[in-house]
Amino acid sequence: MAKIDNAVLPEGSLVLVTGANGFVASHVVEQLLEHGYKVRGTARSASKLANLQKRWDAKYPGRFETAVVEDMLKQGAYDEVIKGAAGVAHIASVVSFSNKYDEVVTPAIGGTLNALRAAAATPSVKRFVLTSSTVSALIPKPNVEGIYLDEKSWNLESIDKAKTLPESDPQKSLWVYAASKTEAELAAWKFMDENKPHFTLNAVLPNYTIGTIFDPETQSGSTSGWMMSLFNGEVSPALALMPPQYYVSAVDIGLLHLGCLVLPQIERRRVYGTAGTFDWNTVLATFRKLYPSKTFPADFPDQGQDLSKFDTAPSLEILKSLGRPGWRSIEESIKDLVGSETA
């Protein structure tokens, strides 16, 4: 573990992590605890964090505490739980994949603004990290060349499609999810520009995240949960709807959040979590290579390739500053996933 020089948040500082029971959030918590920070994690009920609380009590005694926020849209929802925090990682969001705009986009915006307002009213907060998504920049477009995505890229198309596509369209839920991430992040940057609070905002934009599932009881519906279902021979129709795209290790996503919270040179950045491209046949080929004695489903029909390119210079700077030479490979990420589920 690399020592963090001139960290914005001194070791031992308290960080509030919203939606801490989620798959990505649990990896953010893990990296914060591993690097000497204290974490207060929120969930809609204490039971949703019970297994993770036991894990972290055993590994990092006295450094993780559970806080219940039943409704992130309620006025003042975070006002109490944020007290004493030096940093905030706002990861809680709506992941129902409903195709109804008002059920997904509206609460995503409202929850984000609630957390920002609470931070603005809390003098101890120095950094605020928003978990966005690469879909706030673009939904993958297979076999299309010449797409380059940087910190100025926004998926404004998703907002229109989320409002206008018929509910019968099988892709509508994906566009609604993309709109929720796009609009919530845009609202966050607008809040910062208009209110000029005392803290710094950074955003982390993961793509398909693969890694250890810390709590199978609550995280089976995550991206890694879907991949594990394929490992176990279940071919969900939803998989065929997911285009080729980029993957990223959950470990690396945890580190990117950590870097956005503590590294002094990372300010007002949109940081992509995009290690390399994959499709389901890539995953199946990796399964067969790593576990040759196991039988897996047949390959999917040709899905094409994600030919887009991302500006990952800030991401790689963070990983290097935290002692990582670069991205974890898809093989490492899948080993992390399968090992956690078969141990």
Swiss-Prot record:
> Reaction catalysed by this chain?
a primary alcohol + NADP(+) = an aldehyde + NADPH + H(+)
**Binding positions for NADP(+) per the UniProt entry:** Y177
Q: Which keywords describe this protein according to UniProt?
A: NADP, Oxidoreductase
**Keyword presence, Cell inner membrane:** no
EC no. given is: 1.1.1.2
Single GO MF annotation: alcohol dehydrogenase (NADP+) activity
Record field: pH dependence: Optimum pH is 5.5.
Class in the EC hierarchy, top level: oxidoreductase
Q: Which SUPFAM superfamilies match?
A: NAD(P)-binding Rossmann-fold domains
Indicate the segments annotated as coiled coil, or none if absent: none
What the record says about temperature is:
Optimum temperature is 40 degrees Celsius.
Activity regulation note: Inhibited by quercetin and diphenylhydantoin.
**What PANTHER family does its record include?**
ALDEHYDE REDUCTASE II (AFU_ORTHOLOGUE AFUA_1G11360), NAD DEPENDENT EPIMERASE/DEHYDRATASE
Subunit description:
Monomer.
- Family the UniProt entry places it in: Belongs to the NAD(P)-dependent epimerase/dehydratase family. Dihydroflavonol-4-reductase subfamily.
Functionally, this protein is described as follows:
Catalyzes the asymmetric reduction of o-substituted aliphatic and aromatic aldehydes and ketones to an S-enantiomer. Reduces ethyl 4-chloro-3-oxobutanoate to ethyl (S)-4-chloro-3-hydroxybutanoate.
Q: What is this protein called?
A: Aldehyde reductase 2
Could you tell me which species this protein originates from? Sporidiobolus salmonicolor (Yeast-like fungus)
Q: What is the lineage of its organism?
A: Eukaryota, Fungi, Dikarya, Basidiomycota, Pucciniomycotina
